């Protein structure tokens, strides 16, 4: 029996309750596919600060480094907002990304037919949207030096530096091509090559890498045009790959196109490690009430199966079970609409588990 070690970082707010449901789904997947998942829990974020004074204790980092993948709930909350910046819960997550060199952020954006009215776009424009935005996460203008606010002759000025090395570009571009190859074989590279030298180099390297992926269709779009096309023709996108700042903007825009924050999973991937987490925050206002939507976390676990464990069929089975659950009318309060059946965190997972059992034969 194949065995995988998963670091489980439940975090703050609704984190523990939504992660608990994702683990129930993983256990069911293990049963269906004859795989064993071993969970090792670690502290992170506000909970870690309260217990150890550190948003990322060394013990947690050790657990992550000894695992095959990491599943995270959520970090942060108003309780810790007044702490010094370097001691806030979010610092724990940033440090994990840095320590494990998680350079590729994957943000799927899929419109579910049952939730199509949640999108701010017209149904005929958005129906069938299923894309993934891959954002370079560890370099670019957010990290470049020199940076800062300075004063000269009594006037202030500010500097930020956008810098990418060839290796940094090449590895994220390869990740884009590889993921496109596993999907619908179309890659959109987004840059500003008509103005920025960094983007000109980016485009050159994309063209060089294209030689290694002749089966993948490639298009180049400028960032401004891409931002427009995302709302004009979202269904035309499969995989988007881009730098840090452009990816920051486009991944949020793609999420709004979908319209349901509680349905958005994400992954941060490196060459050795990968971390999976929902896009939404810790929602402390509803923590412990049993009404949080666990679907984004369950979908994040499904991404883990696909991208860390190469269990593509298991990933597809989970997506199908969620789709069926939504089609049957079950909704947590955040995605509820009139005529549907309002259920809680555990109840919607119960329905997903029932559908996993019912649909499993088509995916094994």
Swiss-Prot record:
Please list the reactions this protein catalyses: (2R,3S)-3-isopropylmalate + NAD(+) = 4-methyl-2-oxopentanoate + CO2 + NADH
* Residues annotated for substrate binding in this entry: 97, 107, 135, 224
Q: Which UniProt keywords apply?
A: Amino-acid biosynthesis, Branched-chain amino acid biosynthesis, Cytoplasm, Leucine biosynthesis, Magnesium, Manganese, Metal-binding, NAD, Oxidoreductase
Q: Which Pfam families match?
A: Iso_dh
Annotated cofactor note: Binds 1 Mg(2+) or Mn(2+) ion per subunit.
Which GO CC terms are listed, alphabetically? cytosol
Q: In which pathway does it act?
A: Amino-acid biosynthesis; L-leucine biosynthesis; L-leucine from 3-methyl-2-oxobutanoate: step 3/4
Which residues does this entry assign to the site Important for catalysis? 142, 192
Q: Which cofactor does it need?
A: Mg(2+); Mn(2+)
What the entry lists under SUPFAM superfamilies is as follows: Isocitrate/Isopropylmalate dehydrogenase-like (SSF53659)
Sites where the protein binds Mg(2+): 224, 248, 252
Give the subcellular location.
Answer: Cytoplasm
Q: Report residues binding NAD(+).
A: 77-90, 281-293
Q: What Gene Ontology terms for biological process does this UniProt record contain? A: L-leucine biosynthetic process
Give the E.C. number(s). Answer: 1.1.1.85
UniProt cross-references to InterPro entries, sorted A to Z: IsoCit/isopropylmalate_DH_CS, IsoPropMal-DH-like_dom, Isopropylmalate_DH
In alphabetical order, the GO MF annotations are: 3-isopropylmalate dehydrogenase activity; magnesium ion binding; NAD binding
What subunit structure does UniProt give?
Homodimer.
The similarity comment for this entry is: Belongs to the isocitrate and isopropylmalate dehydrogenases family. LeuB type 1 subfamily.
Quote the function comment for this protein.
Catalyzes the oxidation of 3-carboxy-2-hydroxy-4-methylpentanoate (3-isopropylmalate) to 3-carboxy-4-methyl-2-oxopentanoate. The product decarboxylates to 4-methyl-2 oxopentanoate.
This protein's name: 3-isopropylmalate dehydrogenase
